[in-house]
Amino acid sequence: AQKFAKEWGFEKAYGSYEELVSDPEVELIYIATPHPFHIEHAKLCINHGKPVLCEKPFTVNAVGAKEVFALAKEKEVFITEAIWTRYLPSRKIIGDIIASGEIGEIKGISANLGYDMHTKERLIDPKLAGGALLDVGIYPLNFASMVLGDDVEETLSSCVKFDSGVDAQNSIILKYKNGSMASIQSSALTGTEQYGMIYGTKGYLIAE
């Protein structure tokens, strides 16, 4: 750590995560460790009063996420998922277009993201929470959440798996209580168009 810090000009380096969270000069911690360790490291930071930006996926399942949020609420410590697409200028542009009514009432979205990543060991290792969904499927799911919200009534999904058991590619349909639908695909086998489409009663919008 000291060698890396010296090479890249960092003022400090730490020998452990415990040493990091114990430093009173640290104001916020960005968690970018492998997926299965997010919950452990998030709790460590929260218990030491450190605000957290946690890389996606926030945790590997809903149970873990609820535990982290409950602890953050109890300790009154800020934490959020560091998914950068939520903070792009295009997010506001899309929101403004929808709010203007230019494309009418939103009835559905489709989104996909895929890369050829089948040779990356981390992506196919179940012990590291590998698979297309948790690595790249997060982004089209986030797109659906930003546009349609989270009031999902029904979920349908299917996937093709690697020999290791994690998903190689998947397709998800979300049905919302207001009648809208989202169709989402992600893949660790092939590249895709990598765009999202929003369908309204007066037109549609393409987000690339």
Identify the function of each model-found stretch.
Residues V21, L28-H35, I39-R86:
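Beta-strand-loop-alpha-helix segment that lines the small-molecule cofactor/substrate pocket
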Residues Y14, L53, F78-T80, S110, ...:
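Structural detector of well-ordered beta-strand residues that form the stable sheet scaffold
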Residues G9-Y17:
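Conserved SAM-binding strand-loop segment of SAM-dependent methyltransferases
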Residues A1-W8:
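NAD(P)-binding Rossmann-fold cofactor-contacting core
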